[in-house]
Amino acid sequence: MDLKTAEGNPGVLSIIVLTYNRKRLLRGCLDSLFSQTAPRESLEILVVDDGSTDGTEEIIREISLRYPDLKYCRQAHKGIPVARNTGIANASGNIIAIVADDYLLAPDYAETITKFFRENPGAMVVRFKIIAAEDDFISRVSHFYLDVGVRRRLCCEEISEESWLKSLKKKWQKLPVVEEQITTQHDLEAAGGAAFKRGVFKTVGLFDESLLRAEDTDMTRRLRAQGILVYYYPYHQIRHRYGRSIFATVSQCFASGRNRWRYYNKYSNDSVDLFRLAGWRIKEKIGALLSAFWRARQAGSVREFLLYLPFMCLFETSTKLGFFWSALLSKKKGADSTGRS
């Protein structure tokens, strides 16, 4: 998939909206984008539909009556990385931002991006702070789980399998309060409504379409390998709408675990045998429990700790099970291939 031009149209910001079977959320996201304070001629809003079957196409036709400059690309259901790449290939701006359909963007989102790159001409990538859009319990507990991970990565705190049993005391401690400032000293992905200068994709390539969801982690790894910094800009907040049930978060955690395995498998040269898988199973269970306790420990009070702990255990267990399940399937697939040969 080739980019149209190396630089794109100067002065144009392309905002790609990724969607799949979430027409209700998409409508809210687009309403927020078409309420931007930036001049309309400086914006290109492009929806990439990853093969929705819920009537998304009809919603787009309806919205296009109000916003005729809305662009729409529909593809067969191939996953988020392919949708990202489809959007990039069809975008014309020299700056490309990618947002999810469950985001609500503040009116100055586009202006914040263009102003940031104007004031920081050497920057190539910037991401923003994600907050919960609603204050219901499901949104609070789901966001807490993700936000603790963000805070850890802002502190560059690693929670690796090797460190769990060696530094339990340290991992039980609460994370330090991180002063909110523009920084590149973090371990965050180029996600969170991130905006890229178009030339980035000429340098490091497009998103890896084999990873399904861990493509932003992989992209960030390739960016850093080329010396391209990811700026974190916490002064602009993007509101994230979480699912209506706790099971939506559980499902996302399981999918996240599965894709962690795919990412691990891409960069690991180790062969995986059944003995190691059995060992992983034990470590994953222990790790899920310890990580859940650690996340709940970041709560502001004993009451919140006790309230959040069961959900942290549920989310962490789902993530670890997803990782182990993908590892097991990979091993089985490898064994089947060997047997056929």
Regions found by a protein language model. Name each.
Residues 96:
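Short aromatic/hydrophobic "clamp" motif used to bind/position activated sugar donors
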Residues 31-42:
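Short, acidic, metal-binding catalytic loop of nucleotide-sugar glycosyltransferases
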Residues 75-91, 112:
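Glycine-rich, basic loop-to-helix element that forms the pyrophosphate-binding segment
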Residues 108-157:
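Conserved donor NDP-sugar-binding/catalytic core segment of glycosyltransferases
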Residues 32, 49-58, 100-104:
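A conserved acidic beta->alpha catalytic loop
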Residues 230, 236-315:
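Active-site-adjacent helix/loop segment of glycosyltransferases
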Residues 188-196, 200-205, 210-237:
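A short, conserved alpha-helix in the catalytic core of glycosyltransferases
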Residues 156-199, 212:
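A recurrent flexible, glycine/aromatic-enriched loop bordering the glycosyltransferase active site
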